[in-house]
Amino acid sequence: MKRDIHPEYVETQVSCTCGASFTTRSTIDNGTIRADVCSECHPFYTGKQKILDTGGRVARFEARFGKAAGSASK
């Protein structure tokens, strides 16, 4: 590695809006990062996520008009 071209790599305090915080390393100058969500409050990690099955266009069409694909006469 070349000398004197890389940024300073310092310990950084990451704090979440939920109040959780942890220490990591980063090149941020002031040494603090504020995050909106973290692993303690994100629904995916806490198990409170809601899985929405919206279905596709074909499923919505079949629900509206039924499965009459082969019964149409010409």
Curated annotation (Swiss-Prot):
One of its GO terms (cellular component) is ribonucleoprotein complex. GO terms for molecular function: metal ion binding; rRNA binding; structural constituent of ribosome. One of its GO terms (biological process) is translation. Zn(2+) binds at C16, C18, C38, C41. Keywords: Metal-binding, Ribonucleoprotein, Ribosomal protein, RNA-binding, rRNA-binding, Zinc. Its cofactor is Zn(2+). Binds 1 zinc ion per subunit. InterPro entries: Ribosomal_bL28/bL31-like_sf, Ribosomal_bL31, Ribosomal_bL31_A, Ribosomal_bL31_sf. Pfam families: Ribosomal_L31. PANTHER family: 50S RIBOSOMAL PROTEIN L31, CHLOROPLASTIC (PTHR33280), LARGE RIBOSOMAL SUBUNIT PROTEIN BL31C (PTHR33280:SF1). NCBIfam families: L31, PRK00019.1, PRK00528.1. Part of the 50S ribosomal subunit. Binds the 23S rRNA. Belongs to the bacterial ribosomal protein bL31 family. Type A subfamily. This is Large ribosomal subunit protein bL31. It comes from Streptomyces griseus subsp. griseus (strain JCM 4626 / CBS 651.72 / NBRC 13350 / KCC S-0626 / ISP 5235). The lineage of its organism: Bacteria, Bacillati, Actinomycetota, Actinomycetes, Kitasatosporales.
